[in-house]
């Protein structure tokens, strides 16, 4: 029995290594093809097609080739968001408008989890604006706020630090509780902060829990037919990314 168990574990480990290597090979091929198509579009003078292919290539690079990086700078995450929104704007034309507002350029040097914002924006497009008949807007905004920490062990000792607010909101159809297999309470039916079990949101919350413990907030407000607002509050953290992080 023990020999069989060891063999099965070794087999699983080998399969995992093979799958990892395969996952590394396929993206390189795809990006080479994209680069070739982009170049052909550029040479043919088709600037619109060139920009779309280039944006898609950059989006995929940000999602796949940097998968080992846990945290990146805000400006790098925003580049991924902008590439995604550019492509969706090309797809939906006048149906989609978007705004990205950053209170201070220094905020772009903060470190945040990789792919923290982009999946929320993707969710806003897919589940908020896509089902909507009329045109819609997505807003991404970020600002910092001073936060006073009190040390209970040392009387009257206080420390001022900064916290980062990240907001993604849309004026789409709102959250569909039936598809989420949720029965909203009376409070949830109003445009109040809600608890949720949506898989995408839950994955984001789990990631934040792992990286920040209890030192974060993840809030959602939604009203059917009017839209959804997501707010993430994190410690503001600037600096270079440590090696291997």
What are these regions (language model features)?
Residues 1-221, 229, 233:
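Two-component histidine phosphotransfer core
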Residues 222-245:
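C-terminal end segment of the histidine kinase catalytic
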């Amino acid at each position: 029995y023990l020999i069989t168990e060891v063999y099965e574990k070794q087999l699983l480990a080998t399969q995992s290594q093979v799958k990892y290597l395969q996952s590394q090979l396929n993206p390189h091929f795809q990006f080479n093809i994209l680069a070739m198509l982009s170049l052909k579009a550029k040479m043919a003078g088709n600037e619109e097609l060139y920009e779309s292919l280039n944006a898609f290539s950059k989006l995929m690079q940000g999602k796949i080739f940097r998968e080992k990086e846990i945290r990146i700078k805000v400006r790098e995450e925003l580049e991924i968001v902008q590439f995604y929104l550019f492509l969706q704007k090309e797809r939906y034309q006048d149906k989609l408008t978007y705004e990205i507002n950053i209170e201070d350029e220094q905020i772009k040097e903060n470190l945040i989890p990789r792919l923290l914002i982009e999946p929320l924006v993707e969710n806003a497009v897919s589940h908020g604006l896509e089902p909507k008949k009329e045109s819609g807007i997505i807003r991404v905004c970020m600002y910092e706020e001073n936060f006073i920490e009190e040390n209970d062990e040392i009387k009257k000792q206080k420390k001022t630090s900064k916290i980062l607010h990240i907001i993604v909101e849309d004026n789409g159809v709102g959250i569909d509780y039936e598809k989420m297999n949720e029965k909203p309470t009376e409070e949830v039916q109003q445009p109040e902060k809600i608890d949720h079990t949506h898989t995408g949101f839950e994955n984001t919350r789990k990631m934040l829990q792992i990286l920040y413990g209890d030192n974060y907030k993840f809030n959602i407000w939604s009203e059917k037919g009017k839209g959804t607002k997501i707010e993430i509050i994190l410690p503001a953290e600037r600096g270079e990314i440590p090696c291997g992080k």
